[in-house]
Protein backbone atom coordinates (compact mmCIF):
# COMPACT_ATOMS: atom_id res chain seq x y z
CA UNK A 1 0.00 0.00 0.00
CA UNK A 2 1.33 3.42 -0.98
CA UNK A 3 0.85 6.02 1.77
CA UNK A 4 0.69 9.71 0.87
CA UNK A 5 2.48 11.06 3.95
CA UNK A 6 1.91 14.68 2.92
CA UNK A 7 -1.85 14.23 2.59
CA UNK A 8 -2.04 12.42 5.93
CA UNK A 9 -0.06 15.14 7.71
CA UNK A 10 -2.22 17.83 6.09
CA UNK A 11 -5.33 16.19 7.56
CA UNK A 12 -3.84 16.10 11.05
CA UNK A 13 -2.56 19.68 10.66
CA UNK A 14 -6.16 20.74 10.01
CA UNK A 15 -7.38 19.09 13.22
CA UNK A 16 -8.83 15.90 11.73
CA UNK A 17 -8.00 12.33 12.68
CA UNK A 18 -8.28 8.99 10.92
CA UNK A 19 -10.54 6.18 12.07
CA UNK A 20 -11.73 2.99 10.46
CA UNK A 21 -15.37 1.98 10.67
CA UNK A 22 -15.55 -0.88 13.19
CA UNK A 23 -17.80 -2.97 10.94
CA UNK A 24 -16.58 -2.27 7.40
CA UNK A 25 -12.98 -1.27 8.12
CA UNK A 26 -13.27 1.64 5.69
CA UNK A 27 -11.02 4.53 6.64
CA UNK A 28 -12.27 8.11 6.93
CA UNK A 29 -11.29 11.47 8.36
CA UNK A 30 -13.19 12.65 11.42
CA UNK A 31 -13.41 15.98 13.15
CA UNK A 32 -14.94 17.10 16.38
CA UNK A 33 -16.36 20.42 17.51
CA UNK A 34 -14.41 20.14 20.75
CA UNK A 35 -11.03 18.51 21.27
CA UNK A 36 -10.01 16.89 24.54
CA UNK A 37 -6.63 18.27 25.57
CA UNK A 38 -4.25 16.97 28.20
CA UNK A 39 -2.80 20.03 29.93
CA UNK A 40 0.95 20.46 29.76
CA UNK A 41 0.94 23.04 32.54
CA UNK A 42 -0.02 23.08 36.22
CA UNK A 43 -3.57 21.96 35.37
CA UNK A 44 -2.31 18.43 34.73
CA UNK A 45 -3.24 16.18 37.64
CA UNK A 46 -1.55 12.93 38.57
CA UNK A 47 -3.98 10.97 40.75
CA UNK A 48 -2.62 10.47 44.26
CA UNK A 49 -2.94 6.68 44.06
CA UNK A 50 -0.72 6.65 40.96
CA UNK A 51 2.12 8.79 42.33
CA UNK A 52 4.08 5.97 44.02
CA UNK A 53 4.11 4.02 40.73
CA UNK A 54 5.27 7.08 38.79
CA UNK A 55 8.09 7.78 41.27
CA UNK A 56 9.04 4.14 41.70
CA UNK A 57 10.97 1.75 39.52
CA UNK A 58 8.07 -0.58 38.73
CA UNK A 59 7.96 0.63 35.11
CA UNK A 60 10.72 1.77 32.79
CA UNK A 61 10.01 4.17 29.93
CA UNK A 62 11.17 3.76 26.34
CA UNK A 63 10.46 5.76 23.22
CA UNK A 64 9.88 3.97 19.92
CA UNK A 65 11.35 0.77 21.32
CA UNK A 66 8.50 -1.41 20.09
CA UNK A 67 6.43 0.79 17.82
CA UNK A 68 4.68 -1.99 15.93
CA UNK A 69 3.86 -3.83 19.16
CA UNK A 70 2.28 -0.66 20.56
CA UNK A 71 0.15 -0.27 17.43
CA UNK A 72 -0.92 -3.91 17.75
CA UNK A 73 -1.64 -3.44 21.46
CA UNK A 74 -3.79 -0.40 20.73
CA UNK A 75 -5.69 -2.31 18.04
CA UNK A 76 -6.20 -5.49 20.11
CA UNK A 77 -9.77 -4.86 21.25
CA UNK A 78 -13.04 -6.62 20.53
CA UNK A 79 -14.10 -3.57 18.51
CA UNK A 80 -11.37 -1.39 17.09
CA UNK A 81 -11.10 1.61 14.84
CA UNK A 82 -7.47 0.74 14.01
CA UNK A 83 -7.73 -1.26 10.78
CA UNK A 84 -4.89 -3.00 8.96
CA UNK A 85 -4.79 -0.03 6.56
CA UNK A 86 -4.46 2.41 9.45
CA UNK A 87 -1.70 0.27 10.95
CA UNK A 88 0.22 0.63 7.69
CA UNK A 89 -0.31 4.39 7.76
CA UNK A 90 1.01 4.59 11.32
CA UNK A 91 4.06 2.55 10.32
CA UNK A 92 4.73 4.84 7.34
CA UNK A 93 4.36 7.91 9.57
CA UNK A 94 6.72 6.31 12.08
CA UNK A 95 9.31 5.58 9.40
CA UNK A 96 9.01 9.21 8.28
CA UNK A 97 9.62 10.41 11.86
CA UNK A 98 6.11 11.62 12.73
CA UNK A 99 4.40 8.75 14.58
CA UNK A 100 5.85 7.62 17.89
CA UNK A 101 5.28 5.15 20.67
CA UNK A 102 5.81 6.05 24.30
CA UNK A 103 6.11 2.80 26.23
CA UNK A 104 6.20 1.43 29.75
CA UNK A 105 8.11 -1.79 30.36
CA UNK A 106 8.62 -4.23 33.19
CA UNK A 107 11.95 -5.84 32.44
CA UNK A 108 11.65 -7.31 28.95
CA UNK A 109 7.85 -7.15 28.94
CA UNK A 110 5.98 -4.37 27.17
CA UNK A 111 3.50 -3.31 29.85
CA UNK A 112 1.64 -0.56 28.01
CA UNK A 113 2.02 2.39 25.74
CA UNK A 114 0.70 5.40 23.93
CA UNK A 115 0.63 5.90 20.17
CA UNK A 116 0.71 9.42 18.77
CA UNK A 117 1.77 11.80 16.06
CA UNK A 118 4.12 14.75 16.59
CA UNK A 119 3.71 17.82 14.41
CA UNK A 120 5.74 20.83 15.48
CA UNK A 121 4.91 21.50 19.13
CA UNK A 122 1.71 19.44 18.94
CA UNK A 123 1.37 15.81 20.00
CA UNK A 124 -1.79 14.10 18.82
CA UNK A 125 -2.51 11.07 20.96
CA UNK A 126 -4.09 8.37 18.84
CA UNK A 127 -4.55 5.51 21.30
CA UNK A 128 -3.19 3.81 24.39
CA UNK A 129 -3.24 0.31 25.84
CA UNK A 130 -1.97 -1.71 28.76
CA UNK A 131 -1.14 -5.33 29.48
CA UNK A 132 -0.20 -4.72 33.11
CA UNK A 133 -2.51 -2.63 35.32
CA UNK A 134 -1.60 1.07 35.55
CA UNK A 135 1.04 0.82 32.80
CA UNK A 136 -0.78 3.17 30.42
CA UNK A 137 -1.52 5.61 33.24
CA UNK A 138 2.15 5.78 34.18
CA UNK A 139 2.96 6.19 30.47
CA UNK A 140 0.56 9.14 30.30
CA UNK A 141 2.16 10.91 33.27
CA UNK A 142 5.66 10.27 31.97
CA UNK A 143 4.65 11.38 28.47
CA UNK A 144 3.38 14.70 29.85
CA UNK A 145 6.75 15.17 31.59
CA UNK A 146 8.55 14.32 28.35
CA UNK A 147 6.46 16.71 26.26
CA UNK A 148 7.06 19.51 28.76
CA UNK A 149 10.82 18.92 28.67
CA UNK A 150 10.79 19.00 24.86
CA UNK A 151 8.84 22.25 24.64
CA UNK A 152 5.56 20.86 23.30
CA UNK A 153 2.54 23.09 23.82
CA UNK A 154 -0.37 20.89 22.78
CA UNK A 155 -1.33 17.34 23.74
CA UNK A 156 -4.50 16.51 21.84
CA UNK A 157 -6.33 13.44 23.11
CA UNK A 158 -9.11 14.08 20.58
CA UNK A 159 -12.12 12.72 22.49
CA UNK A 160 -12.92 13.16 26.19
CA UNK A 161 -13.55 10.24 28.51
CA UNK A 162 -13.69 9.85 32.32
CA UNK A 163 -10.20 8.32 32.39
CA UNK A 164 -8.64 11.42 30.81
CA UNK A 165 -10.71 13.75 32.99
CA UNK A 166 -8.97 12.27 36.06
CA UNK A 167 -5.73 13.74 34.73
CA UNK A 168 -7.16 17.21 34.19
CA UNK A 169 -8.14 16.85 30.53
CA UNK A 170 -10.40 19.61 29.32
CA UNK A 171 -12.38 20.45 26.20
CA UNK A 172 -11.40 23.21 23.80
CA UNK A 173 -13.77 24.44 21.12
CA UNK A 174 -12.86 24.12 17.47
CA UNK A 175 -11.93 27.74 16.77
CA UNK A 176 -9.58 28.04 19.77
CA UNK A 177 -8.15 24.61 19.02
CA UNK A 178 -7.40 25.55 15.41
CA UNK A 179 -5.65 28.72 16.52
CA UNK A 180 -3.50 26.84 19.04
CA UNK A 181 -2.76 24.02 16.59
CA UNK A 182 -1.62 26.45 13.90
CA UNK A 183 0.68 28.19 16.40
CA UNK A 184 2.15 24.84 17.43
CA UNK A 185 2.78 23.76 13.85
CA UNK A 186 5.20 26.68 13.47
CA UNK A 187 7.28 25.71 16.53
CA UNK A 188 9.93 23.07 15.88
CA UNK A 189 10.08 20.36 18.55
CA UNK A 190 11.85 17.04 18.55
CA UNK A 191 9.92 14.17 20.12
CA UNK A 192 12.69 11.61 20.56
From Swiss-Prot:
Keyword Cytoplasm recorded: yes
Transmembrane segments: none
Location in the cell: Cytoplasm
A single GO molecular function term of this UniProt record: leucyl-tRNA--protein transferase activity
Catalysed reaction, written as an equation: N-terminal L-lysyl-[protein] + L-leucyl-tRNA(Leu) = N-terminal L-leucyl-L-lysyl-[protein] + tRNA(Leu) + H(+); N-terminal L-arginyl-[protein] + L-leucyl-tRNA(Leu) = N-terminal L-leucyl-L-arginyl-[protein] + tRNA(Leu) + H(+); L-phenylalanyl-tRNA(Phe) + an N-terminal L-alpha-aminoacyl-[protein] = an N-terminal L-phenylalanyl-L-alpha-aminoacyl-[protein] + tRNA(Phe)
Alphabetic keyword roster: Acyltransferase, Cytoplasm, Transferase
GO biological process: one example: protein catabolic process
Taxonomy, superkingdom: Bacteria
GO cellular component: cytoplasm
Main location: cytoplasm
Top EC category: transferase
EC nos: 2.3.2.6
Keyword match Acyltransferase: yes
Entry similarity comment: Belongs to the L/F-transferase family.
PANTHER family the UniProt entry points to: LEUCYL/PHENYLALANYL-TRNA--PROTEIN TRANSFERASE (PTHR30098), LEUCYL_PHENYLALANYL-TRNA--PROTEIN TRANSFERASE (PTHR30098:SF2)
Purpose: Functions in the N-end rule pathway of protein degradation where it conjugates Leu, Phe and, less efficiently, Met from aminoacyl-tRNAs to the N-termini of proteins containing an N-terminal arginine or lysine.
The name this protein goes by in its record: Leucyl/phenylalanyl-tRNA--protein transferase
Gene: aat
Amino acid sequence: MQVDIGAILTGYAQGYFLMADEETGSLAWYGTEQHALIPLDERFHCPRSLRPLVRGSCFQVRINGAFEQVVEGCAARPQTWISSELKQIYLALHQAGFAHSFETWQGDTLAGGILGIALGAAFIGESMFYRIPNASKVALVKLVEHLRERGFRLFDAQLMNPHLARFGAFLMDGRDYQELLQQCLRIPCRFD
